Amino acid sequence: MLKSIEGNFDHPEVNELLRKHFIELREASPKGSTHVLDIPGLKIPSIKFWSLWENDKLMGCGALKFLNNDHGEFKSIRVHDDFRNKKNGIKVINHLIIEAKKLKVKKLSIETGAGKFFAPARKLFNSSGFKPCPPFAHYKAVSYTHLTLPTILLV
């Protein structure tokens, strides 16, 4: 059974998963171009964070950053290595979409990298209904095409 816990950054397994996520993204991105948030960055009031557990094992996590009253951005979406390649990424995305709807978010966006490392994430986001869009919020278009900016509208 899938269990969701909001804001449990201090759980050692969640902390380790996020730490690994930060390291991987920084290593896979051109220097100075990452927009990944560390744990203090995820703890700000405009961000909600959830970890998802399957039979008491950490499956993954993700966050929703409020850009304004009805526009949210997904951040720090990561599936635990033990749950990868088993269609669990879609469970994390679907959970975040449900939470966003509960919070009256009408538009969702995701920023992700354009390199080979990010191809599985782009495939997951595209399969979830996200489509490319121009840069949003504080993001800028960059010459090395680091950003892919999909957006979906919630009805």
Where do the language-model regions lie?
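Conserved N-terminal entry element of GNAT/NAT acetyltransferase domains
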Residues: 1-12
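Conserved beta-strand in the GNAT
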Residues: 51, 57-65, 73, 78
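A short, internal acetyl-CoA/4′-phosphopantetheine-binding micro-motif in the GNAT/acyltransferase core
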Residues: 77-84, 114
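Conserved acetyl-CoA pyrophosphate-binding loop and the N-cap/start of the following alpha-helix
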Residues: 83, 87-95
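Conserved GNAT acetyl-CoA-binding A-motif
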Residues: 101-112
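Conserved beta-strand-loop-alpha-helix junction that forms the acyl-donor binding cleft
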Residues: 110-121, 139-142
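Conserved active-site alpha-helix within GNAT-family acetyltransferase domains
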Residues: 115-134
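Conserved small/polar residues in nucleotide/adenosyl-binding loops
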Residues: 145-151
